[in-house]
Amino acid sequence: MATGFPFSTGDVLSASAANGFTAFTCNTAATTDYTAVLNDQYQVIQQMNKATAIAFKIPTNASVAFAVGTVITVLNIGAGTCTISAVTSGTTTVLSAGATAAAPTLAQYKSAACIKVATDTWYVVGAIA
């Protein structure tokens, strides 16, 4: 089972690693559509900042193999609505309203957590519409 942190059995926990558990890493605000990359996992806030509509895309497992249990937090600080969706909707499923695939949106100053629950299935929870 994924622990949510990139450690393996036998690793020694340093003070700096332990301190990292209490702080989120904030990426530079994206001003264009953004597709998640492997470095976005583990306590990352991906900021979106555009005056008009913008998209946060979740890639297929074949292109970016996030571990099941990965959480990516998305924060929309721009005035434009941010849509969270799959790069390939026929392969990756984004769920926010039960079992029906959806593309939830975030208004300005709202956030959501994208949680990988299976190979190509993500739940999106938070201040979504």
Show which residues each predicted segment covers:
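Hydrophobic beta-strand core residues of beta-sandwich domains
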Residues: F7, A36, F66, P104-L106
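C-terminal trimerization/auto-chaperone modules of long, extracellular attachment fibers and adhesins
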Residues: G4-P6, V12-S14
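Generic beta-strand structural signal
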Residues: S8, I77, K116-V117
